[in-house]
Amino acid sequence: MGSMSVWHWVIVAVVVMLLFGRGKVSELMGDVAKGIKAFKKGMADDETQPTNTTSVPPVGPNDPVRTLPHQGAPGTAPQQTHVPAGDHKAV
């Protein structure tokens, strides 16, 4: 009962053919094939396009580290402020 035999699949195929008819099934399979072809074409187009389209030059191993104004120097921890235990507010 756990595995499906060939006869189960034949019966399922016959029921599908009766419900949808020969024209609908072939039309559906054609649409699936067109979708697969379009997907493959899209994947091939992505491979031919250059991946680096930004104008920012890549950072080399000897370039200095750039920091934003609100950041500290690299390797320093931000200042921690102490809040007394009774002053916490629920959000």
Swiss-Prot record:
Principal localisation: membrane
Protein's organism: Methylorubrum populi (strain ATCC BAA-705 / NCIMB 13946 / BJ001) (Methylobacterium populi)
Compartment(s): Cell inner membrane
Described function: Part of the twin-arginine translocation (Tat) system that transports large folded proteins containing a characteristic twin-arginine motif in their signal peptide across membranes. TatA could form the protein-conducting channel of the Tat system.
GO annotations of cellular component type: TAT protein transport complex
GO BP: any one term: protein transport by the Tat complex
Keywords attached to this entry: Cell inner membrane, Cell membrane, Membrane, Protein transport, Translocation, Transmembrane, Transmembrane helix, Transport
Keyword field contains Protein transport: yes
Transmembrane parts of this sequence: 1-21
Subunit (UniProt): The Tat system comprises two distinct complexes: a TatABC complex, containing multiple copies of TatA, TatB and TatC subunits, and a separate TatA complex, containing only TatA subunits. Substrates initially bind to the TatABC complex, which probably triggers association of the separate TatA complex to form the active translocon.
InterPro entries: TatA/B/E, TatA/E
GO molecular function: protein transmembrane transporter activity
Name used for this protein in its record: Sec-independent protein translocase protein TatA
Disordered, as annotated region: 42-91
UniProt similarity note: Belongs to the TatA/E family.
Topology of the protein relative to the lipid bilayer: Single-pass membrane protein
